[in-house]
C-alpha cells in the first residue's frame, strides 16, 4: 500500500477547505483517497494531508500537474508543499 503525505500552509483555512473539497473528482481520477486532513495546533493554517494511493504513476502525474498548481494557488496555498510518497 502506498501513501502520499503533503504539508503546506494556506492563507485562510476557512477559504481553502471548500475549494479543496470541490477538487475531489480530480483527486479521485488520480487514484488518491483522502485519509486525514490535519491542522497545526500552533498554526491552524498549516495543513497536513494523508492520502491512500491506488496508482503511484497517476498520483505523481497529478501532483506535478499545472492544473493542481493553479487550483492550489486559487485556494490560497502560500508556500511550496512538501510531498512524500510512502509505503
Tell what function each PLM region has:
Residues 1-70, 74-87:
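Short S/T/G/P-rich N-terminal loop/turn motif that feeds into the first structured element of a domain
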Amino acid at each position: 500500500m502506498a501513501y502520499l503525505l503533503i504539508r503546506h500552509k494556506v492563507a485562510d483555512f476557512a477559504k481553502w477547505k471548500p475549494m479543496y473539497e470541490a477538487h475531489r473528482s480530480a483527486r479521485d481520477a488520480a487514484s488518491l483517497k483522502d485519509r486525514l486532513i490535519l491542522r497545526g495546533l500552533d498554526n491552524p493554517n498549516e495543513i497536513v494531508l494523508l492520502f491512500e494511493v491506488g496508482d503511484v504513476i497517476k498520483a505523481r502525474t497529478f501532483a506535478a500537474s499545472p492544473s493542481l498548481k493553479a487550483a492550489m494557488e486559487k485556494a490560497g496555498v502560500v508556500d511550496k508543499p512538501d510531498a512524500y510518497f510512502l509505503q
